[in-house]
Amino acid sequence: MKKIIFYSYLKCSTCRKAAKWLKSKDFEFQLIDIVKEPPLVNYINLALEQYSDDKKKIFNTRGKAFKTLNLNINCLSSEEIIQLLLSDGKLIKRPFLIYERKKVILGFNEIEYAKQIIQV
């Protein structure tokens, strides 16, 4: 069985769509509220590795929490990014899905989910 950890925000319609898609494909997943329990440091590090060319993709740039900080992500170190993301789960792009503890998938795109999860 494929191990999926799914960090979600209950009020997020994109998260609900992604969860519905996973259920429709009969995937079991561990659901975690990203606001109450942000992703573990090792998962944030994994996301930083995967998105090293554009670290801004890890952030929920449309959210109020991000906009109020007025950040220049390119000027932040990886450690500063980690501390920021751990401090407020609403800063993190969601859903934040960890697949087999080796891959992070940010946001929801049905084609990307199928490509990354089903066809692996």
Where are these regions (language model features)?
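Thiol/selenol-based redox catalytic cores and closely related redox-interacting motifs
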Residues: 36-120
